[in-house]
Amino acid sequence: MSASRVTLPALFAGLGTLAAGVAALAVARPGSIAVEPVAAIPHATPQEFPTVSYDGTFTFVRVRFNAGRRSFGGFGRARNPGWAHDYPYADENFIKILDEVTLLGPNTEGTNVIDAGDPELHSYPIAYVSEPGGWAPTQAELDNIAAYLGKGGFLILDDFRSNREWANVEAIFNVVLPGHSFRILELEEPIFNSFFQIETLDLPPPTFPQYRPIFLGLHEDNDPEGRLMVIANFNNDIGDYWEYSDMGYYPIDLSNEAYKFGVNYVIYAMNR
């Protein structure tokens, strides 16, 4: 893996409040749709995906999933498939920040890409899913993700927007966790205070500013007081902030906020 290009002093020079809010559309809560798993297709691999061996050290894991005919494609520099959007820079930059500001001692030598249907995923407590709006799960993926969450795993869903993509995500998790419903998360939720004190949930999306960002979660036993198993950064893309945080595309304070959300997710999940 290439070395991180994040300039830590610049990124954390001003861990302050967000800039003023952004014009946005109201979010509608679409009804569920039936998931129709499709046959697995060969993974699109425009680049190498080196991995690191499991040794018990916290390692950033990205989920590679079956996109089938529903793939929306990424907007990253290499136009990776949706599940690889912002890879590898977002992953590398985030893990360097996590190492810098916490005592977790994460693996800074590399990150992993693991198939959604691979039981190896169970070795890692937290996994990141990019563009789940284009996920067309196989039965093996549905079963493995259900087992992963049931055993204590935590999923971060990022980089998706629109009612169409939300309907796909909601339908997938209606199958993975029947009887569970996503609920809108408020600022007072423990996950937003697990390490950094998040001051606002109005983190403007780096792209598609016409959408209003919203955070939603799935809780164990569908109990709002229970363990949060899945968090969805709906109508947002914190991975994009991570990827371009050293290139001047976005204001430093917004990149800082995106990192704070990610760090909080990890610390929350590692302590529940």
Where are these regions (language model features)?
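Hydrophobic alpha-helical membrane-insertion segments, chiefly the h-region
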Residues: G16-A28
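Aromatic-Pro/Gly-enriched surface loop or interdomain linker
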Residues: V27-I126, P132-G133, D237-R272
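Bacterial N-terminal signal peptides that target proteins for export
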Residues: M1-T17
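Extracytoplasmic/secreted envelope proteins and their assembly/folding machinery
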Residues: D91-I95, L142, A146, W166-E170, ...
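An acidic, glycine-rich "communication" segment
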Residues: I41-P42, F72-G74, S162-Y244, A258-Y259, ...
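Active-site-proximal beta-strand/loop segments in catalytic clefts of secreted hydrolases
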Residues: V63-N66, V129-P132, K151, D158-F160, ...
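Short alpha-beta junction capping motif
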Residues: F60, I126-W166
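Surface-exposed patches in mature extracellular/periplasmic domains of secreted proteins
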Residues: L104-I114, L157-R161, H180-E188
